[in-house]
Amino acid sequence: MSAMLAETRPDEATAVVEAHPGERKRVVIIGGGFAGIAAAHALRHADAEVLLIDRRNHHIFQPLLYQVATAVLSPAEIAAPIRQLEAKQRNVSVLLAEVTGVDLASRTIDAASPGAGVRKIAFDYLVVATGMRPNYFGHDEFARHAPGLKNLNDAETIRAKILGAFELAVMTEDVDERARQMTFVLVGAGPSGVELAASLAQMVKVTLRNNFRRIDPSKSTIILLDAGNRVLPTFAEALSRRVTRHLTKLGVKVLTGVKVETVDEQGVVAGGQRIPSATVLWTAGVAASPVPKMLGSKTDRAGRALVDPFLKVVDAPGVFVVGDAASVMQNGHPVPGVAQAAIQQGRYVGRLIAKELKGLKVKRPFRYFDKGNMAVVAKNYAVLERGWLRTSGFLTWLVWAFVHILSLPQLQNRLRVQHQWLWSYFTGQRSSRLIPETHEPGH
């Protein structure tokens, strides 16, 4: 039955895929990100049929998306086909589809597959691990001019905008327009914004330095805006100050306590001041995907489902929400929306379901173990905070690089990323500086 799910034909589009008496229980996992993959792997020995659904055929190592956006890495180097990741786990099937509805009463979901219409899929257990999307805080119209960075398409769009801006700067004789093309504004000074700004600064000062005759990319203006009072607000203030100083040395203008009021094709208005810019990038926050709201349960302001200490949806037996789709509290504080938390939640739920399938009752609620926070600020400099330990500098950067290489999904990803990093480190060059025809400058 699982194989049939992955090969739906148009004439089967209205069928209800139900579990028949005597068959194994079906666990449906929506989302092939960190939490979804972890949940599936935790069920590898379970006597269950596991169906992993994602609208994309690949898993993304999101912590390095900013390096695709700044041409350090190519998309394939931080991504892996979900089917390949699950190939050795015989109780897992993969379905390329987008979930468009959830019916808890009938315990079915609606899944729309490319070229195969919509079909209903029955479940015994449901794990929602659908991740997040950019949060424009009530101003979704900003998205047209300020793309976020949450998937490979976003990363390639941003890369094309950055590289295309320099091509357009070459073509104009207007001094003001050239300055606008060479001004980059990043909204949001969390880890994503800091890492993207630092990598972009290094790109314009080193990689592109001798590539143009009529312009000097090193004269570009890079502005990092945030409505809060400091960068990296989840880190200790001392580390935030160090990062701000390092960003300034790289040539990044850090403006905190500034709220963005308008984003349009000419730039942004922030703190009452117009900043002309052809490239505005949004790294200010995240919101949950639409799927948690389909459950009909309570959600927080970001659309994340409120769950109990066992990551279950209240009054919905066998339904769990994990990762960025869940609002998880611990000791009165929200569990951070980071990869390590998503992995721990997915693993916990997978193991919980496996025990329940054996007739065992799980008494221990989910507990998040904080392994520490890290952020890299370009070449040779990173910051680390773990409990009382707070470090920064070159050795911390080496630790960051080592941890991220080991965390990549496949051996080939680790080898390719390591190779690209070594090449970039010693030459200053970035080999993924491609502008696809679909993203040509001015289009």
Regions found by a protein language model. Name each.
Residues S2-L96, T100-G101, F184, P191-F235, ...:
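Beta1-alpha1 glycine-rich phosphate/pyrophosphate-binding loop at the start
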